[in-house]
Amino acid sequence: MNRLMIVSLLGIATALGGCVSPPPKPNDPYYAPVLPRTPLPAAQNNGAIYQAGFEQNLYDDRKAFRVGDIITITLNEKTQASKKANSDIQKDSKTKMGLTSLFGSGMTTNNPIGGGDLSLSAEYGGSRDAKGDSQAGQSNSLTGSITVTVAEVLPNGILSVRGEKWMTLNTGNELVRIAGLVRADDIATDNTVSSTRVADARITYSGTGAFADASQPGWLDRFFLSPLWPF
């Protein structure tokens, strides 16, 4: 194997290695817990029953509605998609050309070796046919729960929530991340809400370790499955 081929293979392997999505990293600042912007004042022992800043509405249901409050999102995601396409292109062509006379004189002569008369004629025919059939299907399901914090309260009362959960297993780490918008009316009395009620949801389920590496195809498999493969 010459040096040029070795360099080419190394270049292809490096390029395909760069196409792999980098593994998720823990402690992403975007998903970090958001603390309340206005912390409660320190309690003053002045002998009074009621302290300023510690008031509580008697009819408050304790549902999350402020920055830093905690909400548990129940994951109930299920998607199923399928696609099928068929194509058939066919083209036939035939051309025939013959000369029987030239300036009023016949162009047909006797064949000196037998087998009929000779004439100036030509005939061409062609046929092309292309067929294609493709089918793709995908089904995903994600169930569980994740507890997040309220990062921002929009002017219309919508809550912007986000958070992550890491689980360390024997063979690696499992990650669940979610971010989106939640209506305060959709939050139950126990501060739970279904993921189907989260608007503009960004849900990530990934991991690192042996299981995550085993589910990734090798660099040669990625080359055969990439658009660079000419066949």
Swiss-Prot record:
Topology in the lipid bilayer: Lipid-anchor
S-diacylglycerol cysteine: lipidated positions: 19
Keywords tagged on the record: Bacterial flagellum, Cell outer membrane, Lipoprotein, Membrane, Palmitate, Signal
One Gene Ontology molecular-function label: cytoskeletal motor activity
GO CC terms: bacterial-type flagellum basal body, distal rod, L ring; cell outer membrane
Signal peptide coordinates: 1-18
BP GO annotations: bacterial-type flagellum-dependent cell motility
Lipid anchor positions (N-palmitoyl cysteine): 19
Compartment(s) where it occurs, according to its Swiss-Prot or TrEMBL record: Cell outer membrane; Bacterial flagellum basal body
Annotated stretches, region: Disordered: 118-141
Biological function: Assembles around the rod to form the L-ring and probably protects the motor/basal body from shearing forces during rotation.
Subunit record text: The basal body constitutes a major portion of the flagellar organelle and consists of four rings (L,P,S, and M) mounted on a central rod.
Protein family according to the UniProt entry: Belongs to the FlgH family.
Name of the protein described by the UniProt record: Flagellar L-ring protein
